[in-house]
């Protein structure tokens, strides 16, 4: 009976962790064909922000410069204008196809993320009892750990999130989220987020130690500072 009670929170925890991934996988399979047909048949007006438009223009200019350079370094100095235009036309079509696939990918991932968020919100609203049981199970599990293990876990987590090497991990994670939601890569915004998030988390963590841990478990705070020093 005790094993069954312990298995239920574990099952709920596993479902919460893997449910978004399963939803995203199923939605990708079912929506990909529909979104591709919708995008290609409706001939939707291209929606670009200033950053994306600037990036596309820069790629077109680079493409033209590469073809001109290719003609200049050929054995014969005469440039075949018709062949040059044909090459530009083929590369332009290929570039448009790549951009079209990128737009479809953006819409697909945005749709799956939105559906996953709605389903998880509904799960958190209608499954309050399961979440309460899961919360009690997590608190009991943490309570049974020794103060040394708790302090070591807190130190490991903080070093991963706000440590010396954490900006590279934040850059990868924020860049992945940016790409997943279809936002254009903008170095200044990405650098601002990477430099801001660890500082905010560090402030929240120090405030949490000061307000909560000092009151609940002073010995844990002492061990944490001893390990940290």
Curated annotation (Swiss-Prot):
It comes from the Eukaryota. One of its GO terms (biological process) is potassium ion transport. It is found in: Plastid, Chloroplast inner membrane. The keyword Chloroplast applies. It is a multi-pass membrane protein. InterPro entries: CemA. GO terms for molecular function: antiporter activity; proton transmembrane transporter activity. One of its GO terms (cellular component) is chloroplast inner membrane. The chain crosses the membrane at residues 6-26, 107-127, 189-209. Keywords: Antiport, Chloroplast, Hydrogen ion transport, Ion transport, Membrane, Plastid, Plastid inner membrane, Potassium, Potassium transport, Transmembrane, Transmembrane helix, Transport. It catalyses: K(+)(in) + H(+)(out) = K(+)(out) + H(+)(in). Belongs to the CemA family. Contributes to K(+)/H(+) antiport activity by supporting proton efflux to control proton extrusion and homeostasis in chloroplasts in a light-dependent manner to modulate photosynthesis. Prevents excessive induction of non-photochemical quenching (NPQ) under continuous-light conditions. Indirectly promotes efficient inorganic carbon uptake into chloroplasts. This is Potassium/proton antiporter CemA. It comes from Lepidium virginicum (Virginia pepperweed). The gene is cemA.
């Amino acid at each position: 009976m005790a094993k069954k009670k312990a298995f239920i929170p574990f099952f709920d925890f596993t479902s919460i962790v893997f449910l978004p991934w399963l939803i995203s996988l199923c939605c990708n399979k079912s929506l990909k064909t529909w979104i591709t047909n919708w995008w290609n048949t409706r001939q939707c007006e291209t929606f670009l922000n200033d950053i994306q438009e600037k990036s596309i223009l820069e790629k077109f200019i680079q493409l033209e410069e590469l073809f001109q350079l290719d003609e200049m370094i050929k054995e014969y100095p005469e440039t075949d204008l018709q062949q040059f235009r044909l090459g530009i036309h083929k590369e332009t079509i290929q570039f448009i196809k790549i951009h079209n696939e990128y737009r479809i990918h953006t819409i697909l991932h945005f749709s799956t993320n939105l559906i996953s968020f709605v389903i998880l919100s509904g799960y958190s609203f209608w499954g309050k009892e399961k979440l309460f049981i899961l919360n009690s199970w997590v608190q009991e599990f943490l309570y049974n750990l020794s103060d040394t293990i708790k302090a070591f876990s807190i130190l490991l987590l903080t070093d991963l999130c706000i440590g010396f090497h954490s900006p590279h991990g934040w850059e990868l994670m924020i860049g992945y989220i940016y790409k997943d939601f279809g936002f254009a890569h903008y170095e200044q915004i990405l650098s601002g987020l990477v430099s801001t998030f660890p500082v905010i988390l560090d402030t929240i963590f120090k405030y949490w130690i000061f307000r909560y841990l000092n009151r609940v478990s002073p010995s844990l705070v002492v061990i944490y500072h001893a390990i940290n020093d």
